[in-house]
Amino acid sequence: MEGSRSLFIPVILGTTRQGRMSLHVSRLLTQEMAKQNGVETELIDIATVSLPTGDAGEAIKEAGFSGKMNRADGLVIVAPEYNHGYSGLLKHVLDSCLKEYIHKAVGIVGVSAGPFGGTRVIQNLLPVMREIGLVTIFWDVNFSSVQKVFAEDGKLLDESYIRRIDKFLKELIWMAKTLRQGREQISLD
């Protein structure tokens, strides 16, 4: 992206559980995103975001999350499936920023220990993404039986995921560029 600033597309890990295999997925996505030309990224692990039980939205903003979402041109959300849904803490974090999400691209990565690869969690997140103003891409990445996809040390065991991730990231980057241009050039006031 000569002559313009890089896109910023962080990867949000949407769980705080101990022993979470989705941490390996998030690290892989962050690693592959960092290889893309003209893109900056960072892994945002919600386990490291201070989430008090009071006015969590303000506390998260103070922790810099809001600033990162404001700067972001798009997002990747890595969401493990828990009983057909996503973690309450992910919802808590997503609800902490609303105006920062408007007209920004989002790609969702589903993770499960079972055969469906987080398909149900992705389906649950789609209406939430729309409601908070994010624009979903049409590619998803599903990590089925994630415990068989990564070794305990995080090494990827199934290289076919790299092709899927590449397709996903190309679509996300295209959408992030397009939406950034729209935000910068077209006023909706």
Regions found by a protein language model. Name each.
Residues I102-H103:
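His-Asp phosphorelay/catalytic-motif detector in bacterial-type signaling
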Residues M1-C97, L156-D189:
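N-terminal beta1-alpha1-beta2 submodule of the flavodoxin-like/Rossmannoid cofactor-binding fold
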Residues V106-V146, E159-R163:
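Short, glycine-/small-residue-rich phosphate/pyrophosphate-handling segment
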Residues I77-H84, V109-T119, S145-D153, Q181-Q185:
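Repeat-unit-sized solenoid/scaffold elements
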Residues E42-P52, K99, I132-E152:
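Mobile beta-alpha loop/short-helix "lid" or hinge segments that flank ligand
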